[in-house]
Amino acid sequence: MSKQNNFRRYNPLIDEWVIVAVNRINRPWQGAKTEKSTTISTSSNTEQSILNPLAPGGTRSSGIANENYVSTYVFDNDFPSFTEFEECAGKDENDDLFKQHEVKGVCKVICYHPNSQLTLATMDVKEVRVVIDIWNQQYLELGPKYEWVQIFENRGAVVGCSNMHPHGQLWASNYLPTLPMKKHESQKKHFEKHGKVMLMDYLEQETLKKERIIMRNEHWTWLVPYWAFWPYETMLLPNRHVERFTDLGEVEKQSLSEILRSLLIKYDNVFECSFPYMMGWSGAPTGSFLTENCSFWQLHLSFFPPLLRSATVPKFLAGYEVFAEKQRDLSPEIAAKTLSEIDEEHYSKKLQ
């Protein structure tokens, strides 16, 4: 059995380390498998509304019926983690060992398309652009009121998605959550030490190295981070300095719709399935931070896909990762090479 050197890599964005143990990818697997991820298959909009509570005209478990929407549709989450009228379960506490404070916010669901069989990968570019414009609109509306606006998507049952209709979510909160706070502090420290925006500095160096770059266009670069934890984890970065999503120009948003669709097609083609992932935008915080200098921030979109060996074998968080330190089996460079070489035509078209 050949031995390969394992090593650790540092993630400066969240001040954490990850072990890269490439020899573990070859270990025999007799563990759990998941079902291959697919989209909902229905034959008509009428059937969709009956079977799928997120479809146009569908009735959700709250008893509220959706509009008969024909494009991207946004509604308040029926089971929100935050509300604007949150009542704290007891008073705030500031003891060193017992801290509690009130949280307020809003949670929304963003249905990308009325057709339950489509995803961002299989929608056309014009339809993806509509989703991007909705994201921008929501940031503009909620940013002045809330400290953090998190737009994200859980795609696939393996990452906890409760409905396979193409949709994402938005949670806006009156405080800066833990991971965004880490990113805020790390990027600020990097700027104070080096006089450079961390992720712009990083992108410049990755562009020279090339080995983890997957795809570029005039305005965006898609790459596997040097410190990636998830098997096919990637990051999408603007090629210029952009603090927040709302700072993107019209041409950049159009360019985003094109590269976003292309990269999601590549993801689906890895194992010829509806590739599951967790996707989320990060940019400079909002609310009271809008009056502060956040020029050290760089907007970025992260993808955390769990699949590792096949369409049915994901990465599982195991004991060492939970109790000690994160670890990955596939090197970021191999993941980048795999994604770079994959076709940009969706696999489903070859099956027709």
From Swiss-Prot:
GO biological process annotation, one example:
galactose catabolic process via UDP-galactose, Leloir pathway
Cite the record's Low complexity compositional bias ranges. 37-50
Family assignment from sequence similarity: Belongs to the galactose-1-phosphate uridylyltransferase type 1 family.
The record ties this protein, via NCBIfam families, to: galT_1
Task: Spell out the catalytic residues.
Answer: H167 (tele-ump-histidine intermediate)
Kindly give the Gene3D superfamilies that the UniProt entry links to this protein: HIT-like (3.30.428.10)
- If you read the UniProt record, what top EC class would you report for this enzyme, in one word? transferase
Amino acids binding UDP-alpha-D-glucose = N77, D78, N154, Q169, K315, F316, L317, A318, Y320, E321
Q: In which pathway does it act?
A: Carbohydrate metabolism; galactose metabolism
Q: Which GO terms describe its molecular function?
A: UDP-glucose:hexose-1-phosphate uridylyltransferase activity; zinc ion binding
| Database matches in InterPro entries | GalP_UDPtransf1, GalP_UDPtransf1_His-AS, GalP_Utransf_C, GalP_Utransf_N, HIT-like_sf
EC number(s) stated in the UniProt entry for this protein? 2.7.7.12
Q: What is this protein called?
A: Probable galactose-1-phosphate uridylyltransferase
One Gene Ontology CC term in the entry: cytoplasm
Pfam families documented for this protein? GalP_UDP_tr_C, GalP_UDP_transf
